[in-house]
Amino acid sequence: MYRLLIINPGSTSTKIGIYDDEKEIFEKTLRHSAEEIEKYNTIFDQFQFRKNVILDALKEANIEVSSLNAVVGRGGLLKPIVSGTYAVNQKMLEDLKVGVQGQHASNLGGIIANEIAKEINVPAYIVDPVVVDELDEVSRISGMADIPRKSIFHALNQKAVARRYAKEVGKKYEDLNLIVVHMGGGTSVGTHKDGRVIEVNNTLDGEGPFSPERSGGVPIGDLVRLCFSNKYTYEEVMKKINGKGGVVSYLNTIDFKAVVDKALEGDKKCALIYEAFTFQVAKEIGKCSTVLKGNVDAIILTGGIAYNEHVCNAIEDRVKFIAPVVRYGGEDELLALAEGGLRVLRGEEKAKEYK
């Protein structure tokens, strides 16, 4: 049996879990107030504070740090890498510290994992960060030579549910053609072939379907004109794409369940936005099916919004002619991180090296 500590830092909380193999024996969300977070100038400056909070929580739960076989952290905004479990090394720590692709709380996952693991002489890993990039070269072409397409998506959950589905049907993930749709604060639609995500929309930067707080792809000419209208700053326009775009820009709420409920009660504006969301997701699935030349084993709906039966039914109604539709509501990031660590500890795969 292997015991793992899992660390998943978010902007205002740190989720931790203790796993004995795949069994969760302890889980806690450590919430951090805005006042606490505001004391620190950079994400990295929060490192010692968050580490201490984690160690205090373990002590309170009578869990000995010395009982751990490995520590797994959420991967941050590193350089683009292929999917897998990575041993935390010096190069990774440097890139997480400076934030080579941006500052995000998830950058602390590998840093804290390494620090705790080092003290008890066990390995530290990260698994499938959002920067997983396995795009086919043809997918990188955007149509504008100085803007290549990038892969930024919900890699951890997409990979975890794809593997889960493969296990359930008794096949290898690498042998299946899948379209995986993650619907949460952002929406990512990934094309999985031969164990790689060869095509996916950039969830963070305005590609693909809109979501509760992100715009997805919008008419480019109009966006350019908006940028030069002298009405908005750079930061305000970026916020329209990520943070104040999508559902919230139309209805002033990010609660998509409430939007669906109102739509079903007859609210016409909510009904239109709800239909537009399912329409855009279905359209993106259709695009991905052409990447696989129609040879699709399954379409998987996942993420928080996939708990909503009405949303899933509406999408399935449009895409079931392509392939069977499977639903895995929510996202179990702690388990997905634990599974990644276990695959290496059991020798099922080798830990990758970050360069």
Swiss-Prot record:
One of its GO terms (cellular component) is cytoplasm. Its EC number is 2.7.2.7. Its main location: cytoplasm. GO terms for molecular function: acetate kinase activity; ATP binding; butyrate kinase activity. The keyword Transferase applies. Pathway: Lipid metabolism; butanoate metabolism. GO terms for biological process: acetate metabolic process; butyrate metabolic process. CDD domains: ASKHA_NBD_BK (cd24011). Keywords: ATP-binding, Cytoplasm, Kinase, Nucleotide-binding, Transferase. Gene3D superfamilies: 3.30.420.40. It is found in: Cytoplasm. The keyword Cytoplasm applies. It catalyses: butanoate + ATP = butanoyl phosphate + ADP. Catalyzes the conversion of butyryl-CoA through butyryl phosphate to butyrate. Belongs to the acetokinase family. This is Butyrate kinase 1. The lineage of its organism: Bacteria, Bacillati, Bacillota, Clostridia, Eubacteriales.
